[in-house]
UniProtKB/Swiss-Prot annotation:
Keywords: Decarboxylase, Lyase, Pyrimidine biosynthesis
Keyword Coiled coil: no
Pathway assignment: Pyrimidine metabolism; UMP biosynthesis via de novo pathway; UMP from orotate: step 2/2
One example GO MF annotation: orotidine-5'-phosphate decarboxylase activity
Protein name as annotated: Orotidine 5'-phosphate decarboxylase
GO terms under cellular component: cytosol
Subunit comment: Homodimer.
Originating organism: Methanocaldococcus jannaschii (strain ATCC 43067 / DSM 2661 / JAL-1 / JCM 10045 / NBRC 100440) (Methanococcus jannaschii)
Reactions the enzyme catalyzes: orotidine 5'-phosphate + H(+) = UMP + CO2
Binding site for substrate: 9, 31, 59-68, 115, 166-176, 191-192
GO biological process: 'de novo' pyrimidine nucleobase biosynthetic process; 'de novo' UMP biosynthetic process
Gene3D superfamilies associated with the record: Aldolase class I
Underlying gene: pyrF
Length: 213
């Protein structure tokens, strides 16, 4: 069965920590992005990890030249267990992050195809090549969309790597459409459906139970 990853895209530190406290028994990892980190600072990652003792992934979708990617990785992986990067910038930029991560025993997760409708314009046409590149570079995992189950399946088969898949919940992705594609090494990302709900704890529990079927 795949694991559950919470996308914690809130802006307020206290609210973020309250949600983490509420859901920590039902999520396997937490993903933080620019909204929370730009609002509160990178140390929020350390606070979250201390509170829940779960893997915390920095979803910064790093997409710069190798020298800049290296600097971003060094700052981020001081606290985070892994970092998400874009692959379209090329092998050298991804390798720069991998070099930092390897020294710190941290993870690099590479985007192949995103979950929103606009991803079909430019990312989807190159997603298969990005999946091949991810396999070649032996990144730790890839990002592929739950909103397009057929693409999730194709990308996973090409890359032969663990997948973290966004889009379940608010974006319309359904767990029942992807469960047979995923295995115990994969993560399903749920964000707004949990953190915007009246009861994040109950929603997290519900999604965890759905994954355990």
């Amino acid at each position: 069965m795949p694991k559950l990853m919470l996308a914690l895209d809130v802006l307020d530190r206290d609210r973020a920590l309250k949600i983490v406290e509420d859901v920590k028994d039902y999520v396997d990892a937490i993903k933080v992005g620019y909204p929370l980190v730009l609002s509160t600072g990178t140390e929020i990652i350390k606070e979250i990890k201390k509170l829940c003792n779960k893997e915390v992934i920095a979803d910064f979708k790093v997409a710069d030249i190798p020298a800049t990617n290296e600097k971003i990785a060094k700052i981020t992986l001081k606290y985070a267990d892994g970092i998400i990067v874009h692959g379209f910038v090329g092998e050298d930029s991804v390798k720069a992050v991998q070099d930092v991560a390897k020294k710190l025993n941290k993870k690099v997760i590479m985007v192949t195809e995103m979950s929103h409708p606009g991803a079909v314009q430019f990312l989807q046409p190159i997603a298969d090549k990005l999946s091949e590149m991810a396999k070649k570079l032996k990144v730790d995992a890839i990002v592929a969309p739950s909103t397009r189950p057929e693409r999730l399946k194709e990308i996973k088969e090409i890359a032969e790597l663990p997948v973290i898949t966004p889009g379940v919940g608010a974006q319309g992705g359904k767990i029942e459409d992807i469960l047979n594609i995923l295995d115990e090494n994969d993560y399903v990302i749920v964000g707004r459906a949990i953190y915007q709900s009246q009861n994040p704890k109950e929603e997290a529990k519900k999604y965890k139970e759905m994954l355990n079927k």
